[in-house]
Each structure stands twice: as structure tokens, then as C-alpha cells.
Amino acid sequence: MKVKVLTLLGLAVSLVEGAATRAIDLSDEVQRNVQPKFVQPSFACNVEDGEWADGRWCYRFRITQSWNGSLPQWPSVNLKPSVTDWTPYDRFVVDVFNDSTGGDVLCGFISQPDGRLQNGLNPKSLPLNDYGYSRWVIDLRKWPKETDPKRIGRVHFFFTTPSSADVHLAGFHLLKPGEPLPPVSAKFMEEKVRPAEVRAENLRKERRRQTLERFIGRCRAAGQTGEHAWIGQATSMQKVRPRDDFDVAAASRFSLKLARGEYESLQVLVMPNGHDLANVTVEAKVEGIDPRAIRTSLVGYVKTINPPPYKGAVNVATNLPGGYYRKTQSLPTGWWPDPILDWVGTTDVKGDDLQGFWVRMKCPDDQRAGRYSGTIVVKGEGWQKTFPLSVRIYDFAVPKKSPLPLAITFSPGPHTQFATDEDLALAKKLHADPLSPINAWRKHEMEWGDFLADHYLTMDSLYHGGLKGIHWDVLMRLKKQERLGLFNLGYWTYPADMEPKTLEEWRANVHARFDAPYAKAKELGILDHAYLYGCDEISPKFFPNIAYALDELKKYYPGVPLFTTAYDHDFGTGESKLTKMDWFTPTTVKYAENFAKVAPSRAAGHQVWWYIACGPHAPYANMFVEYTGIEARQLMGAQTVKWRPEGFLYYQISIWNSLRPISGSNPFTDWEPRSWTRYHGDGSWFCCGPDGRPCATIRMENFRDGLEDLAYAQEYERRTGRACEVPVEVCRDINQFSDDPQVYYAWRDGVAEAIEKAAATSCRH
């Protein structure tokens, strides 16, 4: 019998028969009757009988209506345990059967009968798969100090913005140290789990059949015969999964529009029609443009194994302004497009895989504005298909360095924060291995510096300790290239208390860390690019200590901005104690919530940036592997134009847990997409390619494209003297924006047309 056992917080167990205490015994009529039973507008809860994991009874918690923005975000229920003293036990085991499509995440708290629920034990959440069974093993060895494990009175289950979960909870076993897991009913496995697995597989097959039927129908309508292959096309803002659902156009004619110095890309998609395809390539040529300006590469794929602790979003039509609403939905596991294999241009395509090719153009700086014609040729052994390609070059240029100040960490390393024992063992192994990605990149440091600058990034770190943490050679190279952005002199914090000895030690540490990089930056003539970042996400109770640090740092390092993500949402105004802070950085959510305070803060001489990290989740924009490329482009482009942050911060782009860099020509890579905890791509925006060289991703291409769109808006404002507007069709709110590339392009191209029109008007006058 195969049973999925989810082990949380590093507590290893095995499935063998043994005794256990039930915290909630649903076989007891009295205990059944004290459990809540209710029906809400979006969810329902009740005790239910039948054959479950360990007996007749279960507790059913089902979502009856998907969250849509107006329903409760946190449907929840409190179960009442009959056992109140949990101190003898080290594990709590819940058998979970989801009789619905997956993607929702089951969360919980275990707390006392009174007081704040959130002070209870909060185990790692349980992602739900399609129609499946999991055993949720919760570690009870570390209780929060606010919770007395001798007085447990609530076992709280909840979902966040759920879609379709229908969970049957059973077991509720408490295990003492050394006690094995209880057995799982063979009848339950046979009557419930196996049929559910069949339903899940049939659902996947039917979705795939409908996807292929739709795509092939579009190809036929576009005039394709299907001889050898079906050819599709997509923008750079789309993520097209090779073996799962997709929705793309048939290839007919391709186009690119870009300014001088700008990058812009498109995707060509190839699917066999009945027979595997060998040595498939895509070639793009444009008459009158240097062939070296256009490059075709293979789209690579990474495989996610476990559902992530976040949802995605898809826009649905509504009568709201702009005509859309972003609805959250579950994210399937499997193969996702992400790395762009610039060292590979040819591949075999098998079965009904839909293989992507990334066609990227960088417009030469001296290219004449105008319209150009070319072709995209898709070919394999014994066949070839040709499609027209049009290119329009706008009569202006994007800047060499980022149009928005950035503070972003590139410091390759494995995941170690909130790490399990397995994570820490892997980290130790990677650090010791000279061929691991976190070490292999170092011999190509200058190449990485150029590569990052190609994406508007400067090699930097928010958290380094001073002189040795700064890549001085890279910085000076970028200065010479006129591409140098901002860099950090080092991470600072506040004194723990105001005792004289503490303050003396704090000041000594500050001088030891920052005096040398300050002097060197000044000597090299790049001090005007420097900042000092500190007090990462610190709560207000420490603001008096931070205020002291600000006074001292201002004296020691004049001219260097002091920068934080501390939780001052007054941004240095009103009752704020951080009036000496130069740059404040709230999350995108807090920036929008406190937008009325931004202008007063700027009037007082501060800057207000924004940032994302492991949050916010959908419907907000973020950079996870599963999120569409347009989210990164919206965030750095249209949303930045609309909301006007003065900079963007991100904590890390190179958390790499892979054993080896990506190499070879197989698009289905073995790169590990899991980065921070159970997230896919959080803190990890690039991959490491052959021999430690850079490997781009679709996410980072869209990050740069968004900044180039921002440069369009800035050029428009410079030429016209008017603010560049973002219509509601493109972006209505911080969490409501279009996911349609054509809508986005219409706005961006309209800005370009207005720039050229303003230039023509200026010339006439």
C-alpha cells in the first residue's frame, strides 16, 4: 500500500501499525455532536460517515463557491479536541482526503480555548493535489511561548482565497515519541483513493485533449496543413507549458516593435503531428538589420514536484472598469517554462510536446528608424515552413542603465533560512562542491556582471558585511560602460539597547564595516552610486534605537543615503521617529494602502520605493516560476508608471539549490525550481548555465522589458511635459491589471507613437 506521508518541520516517521491517542474521536457520538456544523455562502462544514482513512467517520470541510474578491478570504472552522493536555505528544497526525481539484492550501492553528487564535502553533500548510490523499504530520515539539500545551482547546483549519477544496479530515491522532503512525484502512485506499487517482488522471487527459483540439483547429484556420508539424506563436509575456494546458495562437505572421538599444522577444512553438521531429531549428532574419542583432534559443523547462504555498491568477471578464477581474486559482505541478538556453538552437520534439523557441532581438544603437521585413523559418529533417516577420524600429532610444533605481541582491547560495535538516545538509554539500552552481559561477564573475547589466541590474547585495562583499572590478567596468547603477556599502543595524557599553561596541562595529568601503568608493569616484541599507523589515518598537543609528551614520558617512524596509508606513512624516531616514521601502501592497502619505514624505525630502519578496501572492504581481511573464512586465512597467515608486528593492535573485548548472541540449532540465522554503523562483530569478555561465529566464526578460516600458513613459514625459497615463484597461489597481499581452502592447506602442509624434511636432516648430 502506497500512502503519501507529508512530514513537516523535519520530523521523520514511517508507516507501520501502532497505538495512538485520538485528540478528536469522531467514533464517539458525544464528540461528533460538539463539532461545528454550518453552511456559509462560500463553504460548509459537518461530520460525515463513510469509509475513511482509519474508520467510519470524518469531518468534511468543503468550498462551495470560489473566492472572487467579495467572499471571505479565510473560510475556517474550529474543531474541539477531547484531549487538552498535549505535552506528552510530539506529533499530531491528520488524514486528509481531497475529493476535488487541487491547488488550494489547507492551513491551521492549534491553540488554547481562549485568547488570540494566532498565538497558537501554526504548522506548515498542506498543499492539496487533485483528488488525492495525504497524511499531515505536525511537529508538536516547539510550542509558541503564548500557548500552554496543557490547555489546548481549538484545532483550527482554514483556507486562504480558496477555489474548490473538498477535504475529509480524519484520524486526529496524537503520538508520543517513538510511537509509529497508525495504519491506513485498505478499504479506504481501494474504495476512495484509487478511484480518486483515476479521476485525476482522466481529468488531466481530457484537459489535454481539449487543449490540442483547440490549438490544431486554430492552426488549420490559419492555413496550416499539419504536414510534419503544427506551429504556434506567443508573445514574450506568455508562459506556454509543453505538456499541459495551453492557449496560444497559430503561427501566421510575426512582428516586433522596439526602440534603439531595446530588447524585445517573441516565441515560436512547434508540435509534431503524428511523428517525432528531429533537429528542429528556428531562424529569424530581417533585411537591413545586422544578423547578430537577432538570436534564437531554446526555451527550457523546470519541473515542480509539490504544490507551492501560493496561488496564481487568471483574468475573467466583468463589468468592472477595464472589463476584467483577477481571479485566484490553483497552480498545477509539472513542467514549467523558465530558463532560456542560449547555447542551444536545435532540438528533437517528441509526442505531443509543444516546444518553445525564444527569438530575441536587441536593436543596434545606430539602427535607422522605420519598418523592416524578414522571415522566420521553422525546419527539421526533411521539412521547412516559412512565416513573414515585420520589425518596426522607433525613432528614439532606451537608456543603457535602469530608468528606475534598483537595489537587488545577487549572491548565489542555497536556501538556509527556515530550513529543514535536509535543506541544511544540501546546503553543506553544495558549499563543499566546487562544481555546484553556487561555486561554479565565480570564475565568470565579469561575464555575470555584464549579463546582469544587460538586464538593468548591478552586481550588488543588500546584506553583505563591507569591503570584501563589494565587486569593485565589476562596478568600475560598468562605470566605464555607463551602465553602473546603485550599490550597497554594507548592511547596518541598530544598537540592542542604549547602555554606554552597547553603544560603544555598536559604533566600533560600524566603523569596522563601513569606513573602508566608504573611503574606497570615494577614491574610485563612485560614492554617488552608493547607499547604506539596513534594518530589514524591523517593527516600530525598535524605531528609537534605529533613530539613534541614523544620527550616527549621518555623521560618519555624509552623502550616502540611508535605506530601509523597516515598517514605518508614515514614511518619515507625522509621528514617525525615523525622520532622518532617506529612503523608505514598503511592499507594493503597503505602498498602495498608504499612498496618501507618499507625497508628504517626498515633500519632506525622503524617497519612497517599493518591494516584493515571498509576498504578495496573486492577485498581486510577483516573480514566481508559475506566474505569467506579463506580471513582471506589468510590475516594472505599467504599475511603476501608474504608482510612481522612486525605486525597487528585491532581497535575492540567486537562491540556487541545484546540484549542477544546466548543461547539454535537453530542454527538460534538471534545474531545481524550489528556492526559498517551498516557493518556486522566489529569491531565484536566473539559472546557472554550462560551466557556471549565465542563463537567462523568461521572468528576467520580462523584468527588463518592463523597465524599458518605463523608459518609454519617461521619454514621453520629457518630450511632452505631460504625465504618461495608464488606462484602466491596462492597470486598474495594484492587484487588478490586464494579463492580455495585446492590451499591454496597445498601451506601450501608443506611448511610442506619441513620442514620435511629439518629436515630429517639435521639429516643425
Which residues make up each language-model segment?
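Catalytic domains of carbohydrate-active enzymes that cleave complex glycans
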Residues: 204, 462, 473, 494-499, ...
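Surface-exposed binding patches on compact interaction domains or structured appendages
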Residues: 206-250, 274-359, 367
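Hydrophobic h-region of N-terminal signal peptides that target proteins for export
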Residues: 9-19
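Beta-rich carbohydrate-recognition modules and glycan-binding surfaces
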Residues: 2-6, 19-196
